[in-house]
């Protein structure tokens, strides 16, 4: 296991586009929630995996695990220290090397609960060996927490810093107050800017911001203003998502008239991409841009078909080749955090190979190396996939470079139909 | 009306004269204890339920529960209609103390199968005319009654479903009287559902239906009124023997073809096949003669003895002509062989289907199928898909046009894509039917408006009673097959019923419209239209297509053209955004499932040039009219 994800399902208000599992007005349950997360962590590995996983761990096949330094190969300027730590800690498959607190609104936990949570995780069976509580998560290669601008109080950020987090992901979404309001965000652009500045002042050197393309009333001028401000502030990472109208969300039920068309969204995305590249950012994944050395390792692990454990209601995991997910139900989670598995997905090797191919093609620079894929899943299980990849490259939808395939940059915005053809003909 | 008078006389003579003396009438041979009859009714008036009840009461089956024995195909039961005629032999002990053999010959209940109905009637001496007490006399009640009267059958009027709270027995009696001249007072009251009145009906059949005539000593003459295919025994014709007898070892000859077969088995339907030593004149049964070729047995043909090849055939035999055609294609071109096998097997049990190979530039290899009518087509396509697990593309149905070329020749063309170049066409004629629509008077207005839209010519309007009207139209068959029936039902809230006959070919100003998808002509979408409405139709079709074909990586112009002239156009703009962004805390499964769904959708697409066209684009055009 490389990654540990903790889902924090609390929010002060629900954004109009959001279909993540999160609850309003349940902050009184945070303490019991934290205890349950620690119980879930303490019970690792999940009982259904115990035998499998031990077997898996004992016959740990090195060819199945991508090389430990793969994460950094695109970023030669990455800090040496990060690389060496990464190498060292990757030896134990049972502990995590990246930590990600997502939500919901993790910043709603407050200093006390966050400290309890992190300390608890560090003494759990999951923690890298020999950690000392006072060092916090400093020696976890990458530890990220999502911060919402309105709940980024200086003392909370200070706690985050003290606990050893080395990466912050701010839910900025836009720096136009109009656009923020239109989708029910409860913070202002000024709050977002102030929060980031505060974090920088505290010494955070790996800061990411989320932006949304396709907000009601958005234009290139307004999007450019948001981008430019953030880039000038010196943040290292940007996640740029296209607004999706997810079934059941208020936005999908009542779409505002001034939602940008698909054409405009595509245009905004192209402009964003060009601008960020001109500012030295690497477009390393479909919706992620980073300065060299600042790609999000936790997310890279997702795209590389890596293993991770998700804790909390609705959290997804990938262990011993199986994906499984907890029920999205806070109350039942609090009552019985280890009995929440909603489904366990059993896929054939062929299906797993196709899944990984699809995931890796999202990595625009790194792409998909078919030799490595064949090594991992067996030549027989990847033959059909390679045939399909070749056809796609002949059609100009993928770019072939030796044994490696990459998504054609102009096809990023219409990549779903391409991935669908990678998965199955 | 002449036919009424004829019927009136017939009834009178039977009822007033023959009935009181029936037990005294002595007929020659031993046929006096046989009664061959059928049940005729409008669709859904309870024919199959009555048949079940009769089988139950004569001990042929023990319990029917919900099963309708004579409707053996799932689809028939689902749609509540009987497609294939079948028959059954029932022993019956009458109140007069004698034992009788009652042969019930089931008839198909839909307007598309008039010919089969007429052949089944030929095998009987009497017909139970069933009317739903809650619905009254409807179009097919009348059409079938006329067929029975023409065939010289004794008619026993029966009002069914009298258990329903909305039964209108008196109205039904009046309608029988008014629209058919049948004495309504004599109608028996029955509830096939609970068995009320069925015993009385048996007695009436014994008393009123004349026993068959004919002699076992005369040369063999049998009518084929149905057939089915058995994997081991080949084609099994259902027969009514008019004269002579049949037993194992006999030789038989098919009148129309002269083919000779050796009789392997003869028997009755009970309702399964029950072999017997011999069947003789007046009886109904089957004959097995290892007839392997499906096309060699046709309903209406006559079986005779090769020793007497001069024996005349039973009049009225004709090869049925399909009226409606459509192309069918496998979604995946590799499945063509599977489709071929499925069709071959299918035709064994429905010889009224004809098919021939056809190829489409857009859809590859497929078959052109001919059907007796629109309903026949819908049922067949449904069954093909269901029984053989085949995904199919069915092209827009077409009728047979008579295309007269400038050199004075003419061709009968059932496929728009085979039309000659417009410059070579002198004129085109289309098939016209005589359509009778039965409808409560309050719906006459909407029906007339609907029919006007369909280029119908009203030739008569009758009022069989105060509440109902019969509209008789000269109606283009092509308009019938593009959704008229469904619309008729909807504008009349289900009350209208209809019946039709083929009338002839009439000339009209027709054009062939071609559809182009990204400059590629899709032959399977070509259609024939009257010139006047061709542009409206084309616009409608193009508009529908635009909504059906998903946006793709490039712009797709959709055009409709007559000859080289574009008469309608819409463009599908290129796909600009279809991307999954957020990774939901590593919820890859959700992402993968979305993509799998897309991939699944792609499988149902047909490639037309570089464009993926969903199956629905072809299917929806079946019901293009809007």
Give residue spans per PLM region.
Chain A
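C-terminal scaffold of the Radical SAM
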Residues: 1, 22-44, 95-125, 139-379
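N-terminal [4Fe-4S]-dependent radical SAM core
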Residues: 1-4, 414
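Local cysteine-cluster metal-coordination motifs and their immediate loop/turn environment
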Residues: 9-20
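Short hydrophobic targeting helices and cationic amphipathic motifs
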Residues: 49, 53, 62-65, 72-75, ...
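Glycine-biased, low-complexity coil/linker segments
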Residues: 51-55, 60, 127-135
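Short amphipathic alpha-helical interaction segments
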Residues: 379-391
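A short, conserved structural fragment
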Residues: 394-403
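Short, amphipathic alpha-helical interaction segments positioned at domain boundaries
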Residues: 412-425
